[in-house]
Amino acid sequence: MTKRPMLALIAHDSQKDALLHLAAQEEYQLRHEFLVATKKTGELLAAAGLHLAVGTVESGKCGGDLQIAAGIIEGKVDGVIFLHDVRRHHAHQVDIDALYRVAALYGVPIASSPDAARVMIRARRRKRELRRVEPTLQAFRENFNAKKLRALGAAQQEAGPN
């Protein structure tokens, strides 16, 4: 069974409209992702009527950021879109810092602006497309090598024993 990674979506209150706009613009691409969001963000996406299946964890204030960090450690989350309100200090700032630290430690990208999120979403789409093409390339290589070996064998047979 192949692992299907998850994309985490988090937005602070002042950034929720921007995330909703992004999700609406990229809805088709996001449909192909396993999505997880903090509670209020997930509820907002569900209420928006988008055709996205979004799992939720606790709100950020109640440990949701840490649950997503745990998902990174477990290898379940391989990308994070976090539209973070950097103008305010948050009571759970240590959790946010921990999420950023864990993501950096495990090499998981975090997109912190709508433009960066679009780049991430499109890169993930290309990665999925390449995975679909790879078996075809592998079959081509195997077939090419088999033909090469047959041609080499035929050439040696025509040359006769040394």
Stretches found by the model and what they are:
Residues F34-L35, H51-C62, R131-P135:
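Short hydrophobic/aromatic-enriched beta-strand-loop microsegments
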Residues H32-L45:
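Short internal beta-strands
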Residues V36-T38, T56, F82, I110-P114:
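General beta-strand structural signal in soluble alpha/beta enzymes
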Residues D17-Y28:
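Histidine-anchored nucleotide/phosphate-binding helix
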Residues D115-R150:
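Short, glycine-/small-residue-rich phosphate/pyrophosphate-handling segment
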Residues Y100-M120:
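Short, acidic/small-residue loops that bind anionic groups at enzyme active sites
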Residues D65-A103:
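Mid-chain, well-packed structural core segment of small domains
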Residues L7, Y28-L35, G107-V108:
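Short active-site oxyanion
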